[in-house]
Amino acid sequence: MKMFIGELVALSMMAFALGMDAFSVALGMGLFRLQLKQIFYIGIMIGLFHIIMPFLGMFLGRFLSYQFGSIASYIGGALLLLLGIQMIVTSFKKESDRFVSPMGIGLIFFAFSVSLDSFSVGLSLGIYGVRILLTILLFGFFSTVLTWMGLMLGRHFQQWLGAYSEALGGSILLAFGLKLLFSF
């Protein structure tokens, strides 16, 4: 039970970190005065992609772990480390550079682009053999809720919190990457 709680906390922190990326993008998107129905669909779509993408990543990660053994663990840690650094660096870019229309096919591309990070994290987690269902449900839940929060708060806080939220998420992933790389 103690091990499950530890895994739940660690996975929740990762899910939160990935959700912060969606939150920061949603803050910027919230400036466009979306209707509540649109906000609902955007959150659901991003949540679904944060379930699908890490699932695909975990599937591939387990395959790589089986094929390459212990070296795959170092690859997983390095991926998290690089992903964290990338999130921190891009957090200082303008949000408008990443905006895609949140309607129709644009919403699908938007959700896909926001959830690409979760594929890489899923790949790393698949190498380590985490609980798949727990992981993808946490990723989907956190990203959906944080997207909704970002969209709702966007008008008020985008200028102040936007870059910092993604930087916080990147810092958490970077820390997990370091932990995985240097745990002997």
UniProtKB/Swiss-Prot annotation:
Membrane topology: Multi-pass membrane protein
Source species, domain of life: Bacteria
Protein keywords: Cell membrane, Ion transport, Manganese, Membrane, Transmembrane, Transmembrane helix, Transport
Coiled coil regions in record: none
Entry GO terms, CC: plasma membrane
Chief subcellular location: membrane
Localization: Cell membrane
Membrane-crossing segments per the record: 8-28, 39-59, 68-88, 103-123, 132-152, 162-182
Function: Probably functions as a manganese efflux pump.
Family: Belongs to the MntP (TC 9.B.29) family.
PANTHER family: MANGANESE EFFLUX PUMP MNTP-RELATED
Name the UniProt record assigns to this protein: Putative manganese efflux pump MntP
Source organism phylogeny: Bacteria, Bacillati, Bacillota, Bacilli, Bacillales
